[in-house]
Amino acid sequence: MNNKISKIDDWIIPLYKIYTDDEDLQLISKVIQRGTQWALGPEIEELEKEIASYVNSDYCVTLNSGTSALHATYLAYGIGNLDEVLVPSFSFISTANSVLFVNAKPVFCDIEESTLGLDSSLLAQNITSKTKAIVPMDYGGLPCNILKIKEFAEENNLLLIEDAAEALGSSIQGKKIGSISDSSIFSFCGNKVLTTGEGGAITTNSKSIFEKLKLIRSHGRVDSKNYFENPNESTYLNTGYNWRMSSITAALGLTQLKKLDKLISLRQKNAKNIINKISKFDLKIITGPDNSDHIFQMFSIRLKNKDIRDKLHNFLIKKRIFSKIYFSPIHLNSFYMNKFNTTNGMLPITELISNQILT
């Protein structure tokens, strides 16, 4: 790998570019220039309402990251005390790490090749009396088979918490991701289609979970009135964290959300053009089933084997075209192997895909 390439400007084609326009600058400037309410401003609740409406969910809570959103959701549902949570190993590591944050145990399950999401037909073999929830992940903007997973969760009385960090705007059978599961989390990190630099959100149809999440993200405090405009002492119902999104971040989220469908359409058009150009080669393109709407947060291909994948990866890097391996199996990370005695070979499809995938 060419270590001399270190900055995003050094790449002919970087990993991602952020779309921004004057509307972003204008609303952020408006928040800055008012000289107050950079925290707990009206933009936060407005963004929450807009996201909930966009995905057709009853409630939304914004936070400072997708990882905080996962952590807060587990806390809100009372997951902990060595409960078991079914998760993919083919994911970003916070999908599993956040389970450990609440003293629960991540149980790694294999994925299906068509969506790179959890294989619903394999979930039953991982259930025990301690299983509390299933946490599927939507890979790169492609929905997993969430409807089948939901059916399984309901049959087995398990919570369904969707790690949709990469999938805001995607849908399956006409249903927006964020409206199907008990709760869904989104990330607004820099490489997402809708980005605020950092940020996250949770959608749910449960009012009680919504109320718990608001306490968890802000010190366990009841904010019937803006904390910084209330001369009286606040009421604290529980312990909580400082996971709030700032007003400036929320303002950027509002303007980015207005452009989201346009950005998705551009990505889908670009993906189609790339597919037309590379389909003659010996590779597989990750597009998902016909009933799903892939937003192409990432464009990923599968090569024949690890050797070919690695050679292409290094070739692209030398040509200053950024490519990356999303993802290496979490269960083969040294920390998880040491802690849970996870081994090579236990998740054959995950391990196969991880050796072939290139983004």
Predicted regions and their residues:
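PLP-dependent aminotransferase-like
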Residues: 75-164, 171
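Short beta-strand-to-turn element immediately C-terminal to the catalytic PLP-Schiff-base lysine
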Residues: 186-187, 200-205, 254
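Short, conserved catalytic or interaction motifs in soluble domains
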Residues: 65, 111, 139, 190, ...
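N-terminal "arm"/small-domain region of PLP-dependent enzymes with the aminotransferase-like
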Residues: 1-37, 235-237
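Conserved active-site segment immediately N-terminal to the catalytic lysine
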Residues: 162-196, 211, 225, 232-237
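PLP-dependent aminotransferase class I/II
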Residues: 42-50, 54-60, 121, 125, ...
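Phosphate-binding glycine-rich loop
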Residues: 36-84, 98-102, 108-110, 175
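Structural detector of well-ordered beta-strand residues that form the stable sheet scaffold
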Residues: 61, 86, 107, 160-161, ...
